[in-house]
């Protein structure tokens, strides 16, 4: 596979010319919107980028892509993104809200949102994947946040009621810390 890293619109991407895909690999620190002293309200991950007049679908967010970036309070991840790698948003202290619009694979026990102030998730995907994502957050000691009970999870209005009842309307346990977390589930998307 032939890949190249290119700078486009404030981000670096690793592109694959063969299948016209791109993985957001890191921020461009020279871009003024990512200065440490500036907090943006919203960061929208693009669904595509261009290189040499060719369009590339943004399909992933790389390992540590936004690590220790404090420039945004929320991130909106489009349907084109199908994976987020470990530590992608590690230590993003300003991050409070994540919108995940598609069927994203998030590796287990990899601290994608560790050491953030995440208090709200908007999840448009599969309910069972959401359950395992939340279970991973609660059971992973390194990413456990004491205020998870205060976290609100927004899901689609048309979500399967039986799946919601079976997977989300019960506490998730952290056996090592002897804790149970009951997320607030809101069907409003």
Give, region by region, the residue ranges found by the protein language model.
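Short beta-strand element of the conserved SAM-dependent methyltransferase core
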Residues: 24, 137-138, 144, 185
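Structural signature of tandem-repeat unit edges
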Residues: 8, 12, 17-22, 31-60, ...
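N-terminal low-complexity, Pro/Thr/Ser-rich intrinsically disordered segments
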Residues: 1-9
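Short, aromatic/basic amphipathic alpha-helical patches
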Residues: 111, 133-142, 162-180
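An N-terminally focused, membrane-permeabilizing/fusogenic/translocator signature enriched
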Residues: 26-28, 64
């Amino acid at each position: 596979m032939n890949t190249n890293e290119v700078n486009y619109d404030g981000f670096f991407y690793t592109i694959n010319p063969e299948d016209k895909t791109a993985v957001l690999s890191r921020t461009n620190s020279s871009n003024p919107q990512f200065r440490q002293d500036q907090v943006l309200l919203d960061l929208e991950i693009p669904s595509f980028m261009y290189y040499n007049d060719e369009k590339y679908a943004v399909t992933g967010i790389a390992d540590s892509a936004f690590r220790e970036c404090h420039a945004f309070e929320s991130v909106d991840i489009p349907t084109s993104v199908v994976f987020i790698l470990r530590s992608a948003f590690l230590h993003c202290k300003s991050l409070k809200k994540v919108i995940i619009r598609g069927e994203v694979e998030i590796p287990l026990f990899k601290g994608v949102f560790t050491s953030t102030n995440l208090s709200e998730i908007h999840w448009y995907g599969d309910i069972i994947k959401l359950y395992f994502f939340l279970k991973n957050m609660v059971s992973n000691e390194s990413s456990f946040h004491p205020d998870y009970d205060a976290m609100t999870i927004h899901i689609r209005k048309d979500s399967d009621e039986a799946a919601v009842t079976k997977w989300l309307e019960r506490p998730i346990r952290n056996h090592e810390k002897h804790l149970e977390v009951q997320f607030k589930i809101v069907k409003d998307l």
